[in-house]
Amino acid sequence: MELNLKMDRSKELFEESKKYLVGGVNSPVRSFKPFPFFVKSAKDCFLYDEDGNEFIDYCLAYGPMVLGHANENILNAVKSQMDLGTAYGVPSEKEITLAKEVINRIPCAEMVRFVNSGTEATMGAIRLARGVTGRDKIIKFEGAFHGAHDYVLVKTGSGALTHGAPNSPGIPEDTTKNTLLIPFNDEDAVRKVISENKDEIACIILEPVMGNVGCILPQDGYLQFLREITEENGILLIFDEVITGFRLSKGGAQEYFGIKSDLATIGKILGGGFPIGAITGKKEYMEQFSPSGQIYQAGTFNGNPVSVTAGIETLKNLDDKFYKETTKKADILSNFLRETAEKYNVSTKVYNVASIFQIYFNEKEVVTYEDAKSSDTEKFMRYFYTLLENGVFVAPSQFECCFTSIKHNDEVLEKTMNAIDIAMKKL
């Protein structure tokens, strides 16, 4: 695939990178053919590559950069903190400050344990659920991505699905024998698996909006159904809000949909561009973590002062006006995608919620993992390449989602819609 872009330096760097980094990248989602562009800098909603190309960014580092790249307030706060130290190994007051902010926003949050990534958060939350209930089995939905750890790398989405390995080799069958897989949005499947595994299931873990297989929305009443059936059966409900946390609303998906889970995992936006994750939930459960309880979770960089500082500064800016504006931008683009696809007679389904959106090249509604997999991925990549050639960057996969930030202004949206029109016309 030859792109109509000057990418000589990126090609050169990719060839060199392959000698030292596996596949030339440090995360599979960053890889696409013939080679990814290499970023030199980023500002607001733009990426600038090593060849001098400018791209409007709707990937936003896969979600965290809601305030745009290189936000001055965050940078200034972080620089001030770095003068005071970058890692302590003992508690600091800012950890309390950020924890209070999380608790004030997230409905289920009564206590917090900071970790270093979304993967660590979901791993810890599942361990906590098992420890609290004394049960081993977990329910996971097909296509949901809950990080790169063994218990959940089964029929997963994100880069694993994109690169053809939704069930990762290297994971013993014994490790996943207690992971029960069912389709999303299917109430009967939930009832059946709970009935067949009575008093053995510790938790149901889910992405309230499945953002790692595109953008699959919960059908009306589905999250409420999960809340009710878990309560009836002594099963903990875990919302994996690594994507939706602080993205859908101030209180994430719980506030947006009006459903309170037992535990929640958050990340991405929480760190304002720095590595962080968090497990949060009801006090009676959270206090079972060591040192107040016996369930062990630890990390050298847990509550890192630099990441925590960036998180505090980020959350300061996420008010009602912010959510209204970012949602409006995603609505505009989503509606334009629908209109333009119809204009050029391209079969698509477009889904959006708050500032998340994605297009599927599919004739049928996408409500499950299998629906998403039936989409025309080759057509999506042609759409992706045309957008890229016209200065717009979205995640290079049908099975990721797009995001708007506060920095996507009217001029940027106009340029984006022009690129979309060109891409749809070519299809």
From Swiss-Prot:
<dbReference type="InterPro" id="IPR015424">
    <property type="entry name" value="PyrdxlP-dep_Trfase"/>
</dbReference>
<dbReference type="InterPro" id="IPR005814">
    <property type="entry name" value="Aminotrans_3"/>
</dbReference>
<dbReference type="GO" id="GO:0042286">
    <property type="term" value="F:glutamate-1-semialdehyde 2,1-aminomutase activity"/>
</dbReference>
<comment type="pathway">
    <text>Porphyrin-containing compound metabolism; protoporphyrin-IX biosynthesis; 5-aminolevulinate from L-glutamyl-tRNA(Glu): step 2/2.</text>
</comment>
<keyword id="KW-0627">Porphyrin biosynthesis</keyword>
<dbReference type="GO" id="GO:0006782">
    <property type="term" value="P:protoporphyrinogen IX biosynthetic process"/>
</dbReference>
<keyword id="KW-0963">Cytoplasm</keyword>
<comment type="similarity">
    <text>Belongs to the class-III pyridoxal-phosphate-dependent aminotransferase family. HemL subfamily.</text>
</comment>
<dbReference type="GO" id="GO:0030170">
    <property type="term" value="F:pyridoxal phosphate binding"/>
</dbReference>
<protein>
    <recommendedName>
        <fullName>Glutamate-1-semialdehyde 2,1-aminomutase</fullName>
        <ecNumber>5.4.3.8</ecNumber>
    </recommendedName>
</protein>
<dbReference type="GO" id="GO:0005737">
    <property type="term" value="C:cytoplasm"/>
</dbReference>
<dbReference type="InterPro" id="IPR015421">
    <property type="entry name" value="PyrdxlP-dep_Trfase_major"/>
</dbReference>
<dbReference type="InterPro" id="IPR004639">
    <property type="entry name" value="4pyrrol_synth_GluAld_NH2Trfase"/>
</dbReference>
<keyword id="KW-0663">Pyridoxal phosphate</keyword>
<dbReference type="InterPro" id="IPR049704">
    <property type="entry name" value="Aminotrans_3_PPA_site"/>
</dbReference>
<dbReference type="InterPro" id="IPR015422">
    <property type="entry name" value="PyrdxlP-dep_Trfase_small"/>
</dbReference>
<keyword id="KW-0413">Isomerase</keyword>
<dbReference type="Pfam" id="PF00202">
    <property type="entry name" value="Aminotran_3"/>
</dbReference>
<dbReference type="GO" id="GO:0008483">
    <property type="term" value="F:transaminase activity"/>
</dbReference>
<feature type="modified residue" description="N6-(pyridoxal phosphate)lysine">
    <location>
        <position position="268"/>
    </location>
</feature>
